[in-house]
Regions:
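Acidic, glycine/proline-rich low-complexity segments that act as flexible tails and inter-domain linkers
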Residues: 1-43, 67, 93-99
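Short cysteine clusters
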Residues: 55-58
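Immediate flanking context of iron-sulfur cluster ligation sites
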Residues: 35-53, 74-81
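Iron-sulfur (Fe-S) cluster-binding segments and ferredoxin-like electron-carrier domains
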Residues: 19-21, 60-75
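C-terminal structural segments of small proteins and small subunits
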Residues: 72-99
Length: 99
């Protein structure tokens, strides 16, 4: 499905657009820093988004980070179901455009 080693190719973005990528990595670090939300909660949100966007790299990376932050199977299950509900809800509410 995916090969995590492919992420090594991000170095080409770092070399090709160094200022933009430096800004991206700084933004990413700041977004996941502890704040009003704990790191664990942020990782659970990231899992929900990754499941919705269906990014296998993000799913793997953020699941590991969430587990490292103490997330349980029950937390991961609930995050998964929230993502599923949001995705399904989007289809249902967009159905209003059919009428």
């Amino acid at each position: 499905m995916h090969d995590m080693k492919k992420l090594d190719n991000l170095k080409h973005l770092d070399k090709g657009a160094p200022e933009a990528m430096k800004a991206f990595w700084a933004f990413d670090k700041a977004a996941f820093a502890e704040g009003a939300l704990t790191g664990q909660v942020k990782q659970l949100i990231a899992i929900g988004v990754a499941l919705t966007t269906q990014c296998p790299y993000c799913i793997e990376i953020h699941t590991k980070a969430a587990r490292d932050a103490g997330a349980t199977d029950a937390m991961l299950a609930e995050a998964t179901l929230v993502a599923a509900a949001i995705r399904a809800g989007g289809a249902v509410t967009h159905g209003a455009h059919c009428f």
